């Protein structure tokens, strides 16, 4: 556990403070990550007490599993995976990769550098040649089928209370078997939450939830929002960030999950109640 001052740049909403107090709880557990997810969520729920908030959850791992199993090039899958946390860019790439490529004139030239001027900037002729080779290879790739795009859309559009969402995901897993293990983990997490006294019927789940939050969340993700103050940012947030520990540890990783509460926002809610 920890408590301290957080400094955060606000690019889009200048009215939000750049500095505020945050209280957090983190767990590092190799043995039972699902249990750790449930424990962190349950403790945050308990700490919020009777505050008028509603819970929203997601699981980035489900979409990661779906994208990783696409029958397309590794380069295209890599691009989609990098932009999971940028929904608009992800959508643009998905549309691009599901449309037959239009060969650019320059790709068909025997010598695209004929009559070229002097090299300017950091990119050398060899870099441009490599990029042209990549574009030629990409132009030969079979587009992602409309059926697969429709399945991804159906996956991203799932939004319901947790038990119903799990059922809907299992139905979709019939056509998308690659998401099965991730959905199984979600179901196990739901049971673990219920075991800890959390009312799972009041937890909303959306496959897309968390894609515009912190990019380092790569699995379970959650947030608590004021029911009557839609102008406020999340009162509490959290999630799993296994990949971040691997990045920071330079290959030495440990499964990690945590959550934070904004005491100032919680006091605002209690004062308004």
Describe every region a protein language model picked out:
Residues 1-2, 78, 96, 205:
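Short coil/turn segments at secondary-structure boundaries
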Residues 19-24, 57-66:
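Short, conserved phosphate-binding/catalytic loop or strand-edge motifs used
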Residues 48, 70-71, 88, 193:
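Short, well-ordered alpha-helical segments in soluble proteins
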Residues 55-59, 83, 207:
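A generic structural motif
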Residues 72-102, 226-227:
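Acidic, His- and aromatic-enriched active-site or binding-groove loops in soluble protein domains
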């Amino acid at each position: 556990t920890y408590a301290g001052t957080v400094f955060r740049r606000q690019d889009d909403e200048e009215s939000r403070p750049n500095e505020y107090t945050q209280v957090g709880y983190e767990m590092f557990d190799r043995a039972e990550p699902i249990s750790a997810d449930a424990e962190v969520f349950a403790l945050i729920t308990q700490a919020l007490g009777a505050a008028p908030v509603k819970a929203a959850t997601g699981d980035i791992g489900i979409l990661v599993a779906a994208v990783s199993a696409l029958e397309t090039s590794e380069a295209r899958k890599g691009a989609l995976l990098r932009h999971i946390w940028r929904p608009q860019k992800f959508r643009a790439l998905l549309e691009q990769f599901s449309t037959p490529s239009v060969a650019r004139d320059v790709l068909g030239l025997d010598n695209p550098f004929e009559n070229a001027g002097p090299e300017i900037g950091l990119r050398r002729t060899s870099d441009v040649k490599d990029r042209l080779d990549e574009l030629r290879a990409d132009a030969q790739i079979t587009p992602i089928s409309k059926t697969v795009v429709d399945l991804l859309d159906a996956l991203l559009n799932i939004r319901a209370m947790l038990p119903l969402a799990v059922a809907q995901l299992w139905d979709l897993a019939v056509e998308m078997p690659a998401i099965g293990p991730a959905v199984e983990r979600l179901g196990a997490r739901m049971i673990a939450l219920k075991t800890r006294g959390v009312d799972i019927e009041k937890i909303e789940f959306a496959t897309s939830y968390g894609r515009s939050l912190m990019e380092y969340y790569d699995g379970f993700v959650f947030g608590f929002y004021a029911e009557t103050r839609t102008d406020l940012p999340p009162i509490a947030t959290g999630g799993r960030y296994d990949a971040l520990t691997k990045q920071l540890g330079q290959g030495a990783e440990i499964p990690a999950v945590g959550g934070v509460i904004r005491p100032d926002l919680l006091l605002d809610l209690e004062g308004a109640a």
